[in-house]
Each structure stands twice: as C-alpha cells, then as structure tokens.
Amino acid sequence: MGKNNSGSRNEVLVRGAEQALDQMKYEIAQEFGVQLGADTTARSNGSVGGEITKRLVAMAEQQLGGRANR
C-alpha cells in the first residue's frame, strides 16, 4: 500500500463525498441514539461505522444490479 502523508488511511476518492458521508454518519448515530465523540465507547462509535458500511454496500449493490438488468 502507498504511504498517505495525512496520517489517515481514509481517503475520499470522490469529490464532495466527504460531506455526504459525514451527514450519513450523524443521521445513523441519531437513529442509534449514539452521541459521537471522544467520550463515546469504541463499540458505540464502531456500530455507526459498521452501519455506514452496510448501507454503502447496499447502495452499490443496487446500482450494480440496475446496470446488470439494462
């Protein structure tokens, strides 16, 4: 893997996606009743991240499935 000088391994590949991902993160946290932040347990914060991943995968599957049916 290439070295990322920012210190973060999360790299936004689509311009404008970061804002949408942040919005999704806070919406899911609200749905789960999780107050995001340093005082929140890793388990709670992780549940939000896991749900984001599930929803993004579902969105991608829908898009790919739609292309396959054309």
Curated annotation (Swiss-Prot):
Family: Belongs to the alpha/beta-type SASP family.
GO biological process per UniProt: DNA topological change; sporulation resulting in formation of a cellular spore
Function: SASP are bound to spore DNA. They are double-stranded DNA-binding proteins that cause DNA to change to an a-like conformation. They protect the DNA backbone from chemical and enzymatic cleavage and are thus involved in dormant spore's high resistance to UV light.
Organism: Bacillus cereus
GO MF, one example: double-stranded DNA binding
Keywords, sorted A to Z: DNA-binding, Sporulation
Other notes: SASP are degraded in the first minutes of spore germination and provide amino acids for both new protein synthesis and metabolism.
Disulfide bonds, paired cysteine numbers: none
InterPro entries in the record: SASP_alpha/beta-type, SASP_alpha/beta-type_CS, SASP_DNA-binding, SASP_sf_alpha/beta
Marked site (Cleavage) residue numbers: 27-28
Designated name of the protein: Small, acid-soluble spore protein 1
